């Protein structure tokens, strides 16, 4: 007849097992409670966010801070994606895409840097920008509709880009060791999002090259952020500017984006090179693409936001 374990021993083992299970469950629940909650749960849903703060960045640019549902929420926006803001303005529904300058490391709020296009300033756009003027008119506490994540590109890290040819197509993997970027005006925001995401990871080998076009020196938004990153990561991030109307002491390029500028300041065409474009349609269609064609960049090497 075998030795039977005593009831006391069995009870002790049971208590010990329950204690371990309780500790494991407690640890899981604590970790789960500390995990930030995601705001953008469904890309087809609209989320009302409250305006927290509005600050002046430059003569025509504002930084808008919106509150997320709680102080422990993150926006939930993958790198490379953007959001849509929608509002009914003068009886019409207006929808515009924006890329935040904050990331999912920031909890409780999301920041947008937006250039305000006022009425009567630009002869080609006498009414100005509907959405930017609407946002500028908001009072602290007003609500705005956000929707996302949206976009055909996302960054998975270490040079891995998932790019959809169109909305209905599955993403295709594109691996780049060198990332060239041409931005115009507020087209800098998706570029800055990517640059920050790449540079903050020491193991990410991707090199970034940015050509940033603006009309005047005071139109350069987020310049301090860019120059700080360049100084901090001189071997991983190269920065160059061009202005339509530069001051006399300007040491960068002058005029529209040219083939020479691209050749001098961006990586040459290669299988491991990806070029991203974001800016006013005339700049992208009339200055960038024809010059990229001339220099031998294939369509596979380019992505236009």
Swiss-Prot record:
Entry GO MF terms: cytochrome-b5 reductase activity, acting on NAD(P)H
Top-rank taxon: Eukaryota
Transmembrane feature ranges: 8-28
Membrane topology reported for the UniProt record: Single-pass membrane protein
One Pfam family here: FAD_binding_6
EC assignment: 1.6.2.2
Record GO cellular component, one term: cytosol
Residue ranges of every copy of the FAD-binding FR-type domain listed in the record: 44-156
Binding site for FAD: 136-166, 175-210
GO terms under biological process: sterol biosynthetic process
Keywords: FAD, Flavoprotein, Lipid biosynthesis, Lipid metabolism, Membrane, NAD, Oxidoreductase, Steroid biosynthesis, Steroid metabolism, Sterol biosynthesis, Sterol metabolism, Transmembrane, Transmembrane helix
Co-factor(s): FAD
Enzyme class: oxidoreductase
Swiss-Prot/TrEMBL catalytic activity: 2 Fe(III)-[cytochrome b5] + NADH = 2 Fe(II)-[cytochrome b5] + NAD(+) + H(+)
Localization terms from the record: Membrane
Function: NADH-cytochrome b5 reductases are involved in desaturation and elongation of fatty acids, cholesterol biosynthesis, drug metabolism, and, in erythrocyte, methemoglobin reduction.
Record-stated family: Belongs to the flavoprotein pyridine nucleotide cytochrome reductase family.
The protein's name in its UniProt record: NADH-cytochrome b5 reductase 1
Source organism: Mus musculus (Mouse)
């Amino acid at each position: 007849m075998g030795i039977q374990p005593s009831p006391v021993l069995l009870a002790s083992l049971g208590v010990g097992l329950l204690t371990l299970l309780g500790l494991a469950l407690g640890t899981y629940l604590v970790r789960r409670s500390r995990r930030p909650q995601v705001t953008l749960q469904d890309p087809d849903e609209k989320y009302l966010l409250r305006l927290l703060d509005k600050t002046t960045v430059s003569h025509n640019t504002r930084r808008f801070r919106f509150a997320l549902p709680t102080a422990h929420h993150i926006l939930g926006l993958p790198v490379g994606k953007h959001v849509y803001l929608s509002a009914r303005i003068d009886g019409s529904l207006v929808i515009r895409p924006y890329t935040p300058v904050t990331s999912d490391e920031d909890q409780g709020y999301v920041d947008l840097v937006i250039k305000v296009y006022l009425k009567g300033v630009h002869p080609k756009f006498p009414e100005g920008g509907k959405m930017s003027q609407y946002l500028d008119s908001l009072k602290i506490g007003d609500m705005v509709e956000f929707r996302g994540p949206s976009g055909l590109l996302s960054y998975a890290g270490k040079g891995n880009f998932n790019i959809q040819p169109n909305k209905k197509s599955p993403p295709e993997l594109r691996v780049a060791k060198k990332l060239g970027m041409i931005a115009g005006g507020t087209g800098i925001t998706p570029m800055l999002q990517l640059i920050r995401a790449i540079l903050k990871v020491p193991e990410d080998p991707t090199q970034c090259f940015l050509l940033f076009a603006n009309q005047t020196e005071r139109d350069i938004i987020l310049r301090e952020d860019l120059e700080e990153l360049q100084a901090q990561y001189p071997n991983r991030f190269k920065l160059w500017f061009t202005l339509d109307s530069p001051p006399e002491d300007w040491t960068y390029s002058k005029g529209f984006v040219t083939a020479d500028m691209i050749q001098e300041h961006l990586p040459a065409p290669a299988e491991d090179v990806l070029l991203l474009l974001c800016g006013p349609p005339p700049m992208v269609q009339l200055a960038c693409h024809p010059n990229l064609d001339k220099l031998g960049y294939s369509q596979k090497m380019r992505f236009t936001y």
